[in-house]
């Protein structure tokens, strides 16, 4: 039961940190490449 409580308290914190990091990454990509439908470093 204690392991379940630990899991339930860790999962929201981990998912919040993950979504904050993902949002920051998307914001920085959009800041560096505004309105990019194709990214220059993917096209060869």
From Swiss-Prot:
Protein keywords: Chloroplast, Membrane, Photosynthesis, Photosystem I, Plastid, Thylakoid, Transmembrane, Transmembrane helix
Domain of life: Eukaryota
Alphabetical list of InterPro entries matching this protein: PSI_PsaJ, PSI_PsaJ_sf
Its membrane topology: Single-pass membrane protein
GO cellular component, one term: photosystem I
Species this chain originates from: Cicer arietinum
Subcellular compartments: Plastid, Chloroplast thylakoid membrane
Stored Pfam families: PSI_PsaJ (PF01701)
Entry function: May help in the organization of the PsaE and PsaF subunits.
Signal peptide annotation: none
Gene Ontology biological process terms, A to Z: photosynthesis
Gene behind the chain: psaJ
HAMAP family: PSI_PsaJ (MF_00522)
SUPFAM superfamilies: Subunit IX of photosystem I reaction centre, PsaJ
Family recorded in the similarity comment: Belongs to the PsaJ family.
Major site of localization recorded for this protein: plastid
Transmembrane segments: 7-27
Protein's UniProt name: Photosystem I reaction center subunit IX
């Amino acid at each position: 039961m204690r392991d379940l409580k630990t899991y339930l308290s860790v999962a929201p914190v981990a998912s919040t940190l993950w979504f904050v990091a993902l949002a920051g990454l998307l914001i920085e990509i959009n800041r560096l490449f505004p309105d990019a439908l194709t990214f220059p470093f993917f096209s060869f």
